[in-house]
Structures are given as structure tokens and as C-alpha cells.
A protein has these predicted regions:
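Class II aminoacyl-tRNA synthetase catalytic cores and aaRS-like
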Residues: 1-143
Length: 143
């Protein structure tokens, strides 16, 4: 699990980061991959061989990237990861396709309740609970 503050402290360094894919946008000369872990997300810019290596990524797949951390004004949060080689890209676990689409009728969603958690508004309660538990454990360990 990564936090944005840990990544921001690594500007100018190469790091390995693992996370879930929130979005992949492939353009003519580069690809953008947004990774998330809990509440934190970061954008990776993949060029050259790395651009082709991210093609199999799908939303919610678990991946690892080795990248240089760069300060970038146009990136979300002012930080982005730059990946240049295919060897720096690893698909750890490809996300399974869901039996229904996020825009399905409410009846289908009720038949597949776990699919609701693909939508951010549905996961906020679980994210808040996870963060609260994490902070409580950290507090108790410090005592």
C-alpha cells in the first residue's frame, strides 16, 4: 500500500510501486495509468516499450511499476511516475470481468451486490472503515 506523501518524498528517485489500476488512457506516443491504493492515487506516464506493456491492463487489475518520480505541474497532485521500459511494468493480477456493467439497471445490481463496489460512491464507506481501523491499530501499537 502506498501513500501519496511517501511518493512525494521520493522526487528524483526510482521507486517500485504496486497498486490497483483505476484508469488506462493509451495515446499515440504515450500511455497514462492511474494507480490507486486506498484513498491515494498517482498517475504514471508510460513511454516507448512501456506504452505497449500496459495495453493488457484493465480497471481494477493489480500491477507493479518501477518508475522515476517526477514533479509535474499538470499531473494530479503535482507528482507523476515516468516509466520507460517494458521490464519496469508487471501485471500481477488481471481483474476478472464482472457479469454486469456499472450502468446496469438496479434489478441486475441487486442480483450482483458485490458489483456495486466498482463505483466509488459505494466504496467510500469501506474505505473510511479501513482507514479508521488502520489508524486505531497504529494508535494501539504506539501505546
Amino acid at each position: 500500500m502506498f501513500t501519496f506523501s511517501h511518493i512525494a518524498q521520493s522526487v528524483g528517485q526510482r521507486i517500485r510501486i504496486e497498486g490497483f489500476v483505476r484508469a488506462v488512457r493509451i495515446q499515440s506516443k504515450m500511455a497514462f495509468v492511474v494507480l490507486y491504493s486506498g484513498l491515494h492515487s498517482v498517475q504514471a506516464v508510460c513511454r516507448g516499450e512501456a506504452k505497449e506493456a500496459v495495453r493488457p491492463f484493465s480497471t481494477h487489475s493489480y500491477v507493479a511499476l518501477t518508475a522515476e518520480v517526477v514533479a509535474s505541474a499538470q499531473a494530479p497532485g503535482g507528482i507523476e511516475l515516468v516509466v520507460r521500459e517494458a521490464a519496469e511494468v508487471e501485471l500481477i493480477s488481471k481483474a476478472a470481468l464482472w457479469p454486469i456493467a456499472p450502468e446496469s439497471e438496479i434489478g441486475a445490481k441487486l442480483e450482483w451486490p458485490v458489483a456495486r463496489f466498482r463505483e466509488r460512491k459505494e466504496t467510500l464507506t469501506q474505505i473510511a472503515q479501513s482507514q479508521l481501523e488502520f489508524q486505531m491499530i497504529a494508535f494501539l501499537q504506539a501505546q
